[in-house]
Amino acid sequence: MLPEDREVNWFAMRATYGRNLVVQRTLEVEKIESFVPMCKRTTKVGRRIKTDIIPVVRDLIFVLGERERIQEVKGKIPYLHYITRPIEGRNVPIAVPEEQMQQFMAICNKMDDSAEIVAGEEVNFSIGEQVRVTGGAFKDCEGRLVKIEGKRTKRFIVSIDGVIAVSVSGIKADELEKIG
């Protein structure tokens, strides 16, 4: 899908050198909505256990807005770049459909220890079936059932094609319905 300049889309972007949270604060000031997938990290420091909430992917940020407006703000933030994919010989910014982004954010916001972030090339989507979760914490989320190399159980995947995927295990078979 080629994004139009005046169409509101979620754009997958990269804020180099791990500055995605700095960019997110700048975008808040500019009144532009953004999303950075976050996770809890627990580390032991001496005798204490410290829990931090950190970005799941160091440079990744999703920005909602008209491409023209994002370009304007991007001019003030030299380390913010579109993530692109080649289409017809051009590198086109990745625009994420609203419904897909809402599903992805819902899963990320409910993540627990059973969830993990998976790079796109580690998942073979052709073996999975499209399913909808009908119960539990992930009710109404749609994704695929897949087998990830090195994992014993099937996992539920919600992905943003070519960018990132969230993988969750522990969803009961009776909480799934096949779609499509």
Segments from the language model and where they lie:
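Acidic-enriched and Gly/Ser
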Residues: 1-130, 146-148, 152-155, 159-180
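Short coil-to-beta-strand transition motifs
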Residues: 127, 134-142
